[in-house]
Amino acid sequence: MKIALDVMGGDHAPAAMIEGAMLALEDSGIDVGKLFLVGDETTVEKELTHLSYANSKIEIVHSEQVVEMHESAVKSVRQKKKSSISVAVDLVKSGDCQAIVSAGNTGAAVAASTIKLRNIPGVERAGIASPLPNENGPCNIVDAGANVDSKPSHLLGYAIMGSVYARHVQGKKNPIVGLMSVGEEDSKGTDLTREVFGLLKESGLNFIGNVEGHDLFETPVDVVVCDGFVGNVVLKSCEATAKAMFKWLKEDIKATPIRQMGALIAKEAFKATKERGNYETYGGSPLLGVNGICIIGHGSSSPRAVKNAIRVASEAVRHHVNPHIEEEMARSASLLG
């Protein structure tokens, strides 16, 4: 299996990306035949020398440009054809690689993948599936930011693709699907969610109805469907809340010696709780619906997060997620219109 890694994308690139690649290759549980490190060749070689690392499974692919985080997605893809993200996607398009991993500009990764790879037959819009911790295992929010404006058929597509991913990659036998709304009743929500509710009822998916924000963590649900605007706000709000809670907890623990002693006793419990919600554990989010596997990592990805993003890419390829998506989209063609 060959995977392209955009080593120039991310807040801590290229060091974190290259270290993550090393960790992935050293992990026997991750199936990677070769990793293509896409970036400035001199910079990559310098970093590998600094880390005193050499591996026959690594190949450097030179790219002359970098898409910065603030740049316009579509514009950057069209004007920076030799950027690391574009070159990495080209490797998938040509068949030299089966997947791409990037922690760079999310919009650029989405634009490059959809423009160059095109969508799987039957897929109108690709969607990002971002995992959140849930009592039933990972709960995938689809779409988490690829498209801020969506039609009912797009959300139905997200539900189908999310279910395929949960079943074949995450091992959920009969994935539970919920529709993000402001109340459980089917009459609640916007015109969009009410129409999508009807489509999901007819879809044959394991649809449990509307879910609210608190259901993301409390209710057994594997796929939560929403448009990219809502999904991205939910995802970032959850991340910010978790970060703030642990910050406040640390401050309050330091307030008295007794609390500090208690914290030492409960240290392992705090560590386990933090790990459940740590984005590094999940690695990255798949862009479902494009003709190739694209995994989008957190902008501040650490080496461990990069390693796990490579693992996610490997598993998506190994479980043939895209052929399964094409099959299910064809089966639901009448509903998708």
Model regions and ranges:
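Short glycine/serine/threonine-rich phosphate/pyrophosphate-binding segments
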Residues: 13-17, 82-95, 99-113, 120, ...
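Phosphate/nucleotide-donor binding subsite
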Residues: 53-97
